[in-house]
Amino acid sequence: MFSGIGTAIITPFKNGEIDYHALKNFLETQRMVDAIILLGTTGEAPNISIEERDKLIPFVREYFPDKPLIVGVGTNSSHHTMELVKNAEKNKADALLVVTPYYNKPTQIGLYHYYKYISEHTDLEIIIYNVPGRTGVNIAPETVYKLASDCKNITALKEANSSFDQINKVLHLKPETFKVFSGNDDISFQFLASGGNGVISVASNVIPNQMVEMYKNIISGNISNARKIFYTYYPLFKALFIETNPIPVKQALNIMGLIENELRLPLYPANKETKNILEKILKECKII
């Protein structure tokens, strides 16, 4: 499993279809990051068909043959999740990002057996993805580490719970070989300085090199440099979530000339106020 900055990449669209020309140009900006996370929340995974996955995953794999490629496969159905697991295996993913089942609101024991079932039916490494603000369920640190103890291929957690109480508990209890990634750019500096293993980042769609530089400064002990980078881009971190992700990040990348500002319903392009805020911040941060 990687350490460092993994970009949760967008899926660019044009006229309703995946825009592979734009995707190729976008991927070129991502050479410095440590991993690519494909078909997560930022990639609009629920709106991507199996047939599209069969083209999209190999496209990214071919572009970055040696960079870790983690593919999102989580749904609220164990049967459908396993279909996506087998699809990711077939298309040469390195690891799986599996979100906690949304809408169903399972108990901790239900979550345990869900992840255990998946782990028993694949050899790929699994990152548990905890994002209670979207799913309506929070997986407890104790459940995560029981899974890590019982399932050898459950090797990491993406923690997108903004509660520092939970984050501190997660980092305090984690086994030495288990990795924990933040899913929140706006606390990435504090998370990494507290011993986190990396960030699965939305902001690195826009500022990949700067996010990598912040991480490198932290692990080399240059905390003041890392802090300066973090607070330089802190307004961007916040702005990327003033509407539902990935609406703002797609707007930002459109302003930068990298992609069309197109999403699939029920997601809808950013309003004018959001666009103006993003333009202002991108200029202030000298990104455009």
From Swiss-Prot:
The keyword Lyase applies. The keyword Lyase applies. GO terms for biological process: diaminopimelate biosynthetic process; lysine biosynthetic process via diaminopimelate. Signal peptide: none annotated. Coiled coil: none annotated. Pyruvate binds at T42, I200. GO terms for cellular component: cytosol. It catalyses: L-aspartate 4-semialdehyde + pyruvate = (2S,4S)-4-hydroxy-2,3,4,5-tetrahydrodipicolinate + H2O + H(+). It is found in: Cytoplasm. Catalyzes the condensation of (S)-aspartate-beta-semialdehyde [(S)-ASA] and pyruvate to 4-hydroxy-tetrahydrodipicolinate (HTPA). Homotetramer; dimer of dimers. This is 4-hydroxy-tetrahydrodipicolinate synthase. It comes from Thermosipho melanesiensis (strain DSM 12029 / CIP 104789 / BI429). The gene is dapA.
